[in-house]
Amino acid sequence: MDHEAAQLEKQHVHNVYESTAPYFSDLQSKAWPRVRQFLQEQKPGSLIADIGCGTGKYLKVNSQVHTVGCDYCGPLVEIARNRGCEAMVCDNLNLPFRDEGFDAIISIGVIHHFSTKQRRIRAIKEMARVLVPGGQLMIYVWAMEQKNRHFEKQDVLVPWNRALCSQLFSESSQSGRKRQCGYPERGHPYHPPCSECSCSVCFKEQCGSKRSHSVGYEPAMARTCFANISKEGEEEYGFYSTLGKSFRSWFFSRSLDESTLRKQIERVRPLKNTEVWASSTVTVQPSRHSSLDFDHQEPFSTKGQSLDEEVFVESSSGKHLEWLRAPGTLKHLNGDHQGEMRRNGGGNFLDSTNTGVNCVDAGNIEDDNPSASKILRRISAVDSTDFNPDDTMSVEDPQTDVLDSTAFMRYYHVFREGELCSLLKENVSELRILSSGNDHGNWCIIAEKKRGCD
């Protein structure tokens, strides 16, 4: 069992971060406030370890302490070193440090990547081993309980969100200025802004939908293409603006739950007849329901489905909003450009807001292309999920050949309320919990190593 767990983590954690590490080299993200506060409260001269330091975001928060970082991912450690941080490659299950060597330890977003309970316990015990008696340990893990999202299972696969990475890079490089669209140059992961449209971060390259699938099947991501939809008067523009807000929330980190989607539907309904809208340039919409298969040849039936499950409802004419499937939607999201993309349409589908969704054009969809004529009618909101930025599906639910086998899918074990505290109380007796709580979709605990423990 341990071997299988290690293989899963290698494929869906280590390999993914190693492959995507280059995209973080120029990314300067801010330290989370509570983690920053914890580090700044440590006594001057303290020796602190950041286990799973990544690019070293927290290694220079407090200049009065000495912070050492370590991470399993070599490329991320190299980025941290290039930034002047002290970091090394190591395994959380076998830390290369002597017993009771650190005054404080932080573990931010690491424990949820271990795929079994025993491996999670071992990782925490290792950190407790190298912590001095009276020293404090801070742990952050993803929470299953979310305000606007839900998970049906705790073990999920999540696609790497390149859109988020692009947005954060844009924010860090253009702080204080209005962010505008950029167009990529071949072979470069980051791109300068342009002024042709008002979308926050819009790259003319293909990007993956935020969707995940069963561990027992090959991982993949459906590629999403956005087409510019022309404006036809203020009424139509209002429709697109409202609809665009739904899409931005739906595609990016803030997934809409069912009740929120119903509110969006009510706002959109009086603005535009869906029959006219469907005759305009059509965009690709990825499925949010585990039963949808992009390879079906016929439109999906909506018989027996209540309107509560629909993102888009029937108009007075009884016709559903229809979506065309763009060719090549199941390609690999690896940063490579698959041919020359060209702009299409007059208006901007996404108006200016802080979204960070990578936008690409569907200009190469031709009317006589058989694969482009496949229609997907129903978009379910039932499986709306929440995390940092991605939609997920249970690793136990098998998928058909909807997804590409080479996409970057990360494994996460999302923690139920109280699960992390119970894990420590029942299995790591040398630690006592000082505080616990929820911080932006993460469970956070601060524990102290008991004095007199071996």
From Swiss-Prot:
This entry's Gene Ontology molecular function terms read:
S-adenosylmethionine-dependent methyltransferase activity; tRNA (5-carboxymethyluridine(34)-5-O)-methyltransferase activity; tRNA binding; tRNA methyltransferase activity
Identify the InterPro entries for this entry.
AlkB_tRNA_MeTrf/Diox (IPR051422), Methyltransf_11 (IPR013216), SAM-dependent_MTases_sf (IPR029063)
Alphabetized UniProt keyword annotations: Methyltransferase, Phosphoprotein, S-adenosyl-L-methionine, Transferase, tRNA processing
Tissue note: Down-regulated in breast, bladder, colorectal, cervix and testicular carcinomas.
CDD domains named among the record's database cross-references:
AdoMet_MTases (cd02440)
Pfam families named in the record: Methyltransf_11 (PF08241)
Q: Name one GO biological process term.
A: tRNA wobble uridine modification
Q: Which residues carry this modification: Phosphoserine?
A: S214
Gene Ontology, cellular component aspect: cytoplasm; nucleus
Is Coiled coil a UniProt keyword of this protein? no
Q: What is its EC number?
A: 2.1.1.-
| Chain's role | May modify wobble uridines in specific arginine and glutamic acid tRNAs. Acts as a tumor suppressor by promoting the expression of LIN9.
- Which family is it part of? Belongs to the methyltransferase superfamily.
Name of the protein in its database record? Probable tRNA methyltransferase 9B
Tell me what organism the protein belongs to: Homo sapiens
Q: Which gene encodes it?
A: TRMT9B
